[in-house]
């Protein structure tokens, strides 16, 4: 790899409603790196009993999201009817394609007791020919 291809991406902190992420992409001067649109490191965040993340239902199109947790658990729900918890070591791959709506929230059991959350989420641009593919969701324990 040539020295001209090397660069350092510095994250900026973004509040997502009750917890912060360190967002590496997009940033200046790099809006994307290859197909990667967003690259977020969530946490580590400690939630007291009764608290947690509440990413309300929202749409995506033309991309895929990949979620991986180190700590905690998130409950994913989407317009396909999927209800799936993601735990440390699992991978959730959601392909938005022509459109999907989803939410991500702290699992009810952990909301009752309090929990720690830490993980990664990246948004990947689908190839042009797949941007309008059927939406899909897959869970890989």
Task: Identify the residue ranges that each predicted region occupies.
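A short beta-strand-loop-beta hairpin characteristic of the jelly-roll/cupin
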Residues: 66-88, 101-103
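A short glycine-rich, His/Asp/Glu-containing loop-to-beta-strand
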Residues: 14-70, 119
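Short, Gly/Pro- and small/polar-rich lid/capping loops
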Residues: 1-11
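Conserved, well-structured core segments that form or line functional sites
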Residues: 118, 125-141
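Short, compositionally biased
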Residues: 105-117
């Amino acid at each position: 790899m040539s020295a001209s291809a090397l660069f350092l991406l510095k994250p900026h902190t973004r509040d997502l409603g009750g917890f912060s992420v360190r967002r590496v992409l997009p940033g200046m001067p790099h809006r994307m790196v290859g197909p990667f649109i967003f690259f977020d490191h969530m946490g580590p965040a400690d939630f007291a009993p009764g608290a947690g993340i509440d990413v309300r239902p929202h749409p995506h199109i033309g991309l895929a999201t990949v979620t991986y947790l180190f700590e905690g658990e998130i409950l994913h729900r989407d317009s396909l009817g999927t209800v799936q918890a993601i735990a440390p070591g699992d991978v959730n791959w959601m392909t938005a394609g022509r459109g999907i709506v989803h939410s991500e929230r702290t699992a009810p059991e952990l909301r009752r007791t309090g929990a720690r959350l830490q993980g990664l989420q990246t948004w990947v641009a689908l190839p042009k020919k797949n941007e309008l593919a059927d939406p899909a969701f897959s869970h890989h324990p």
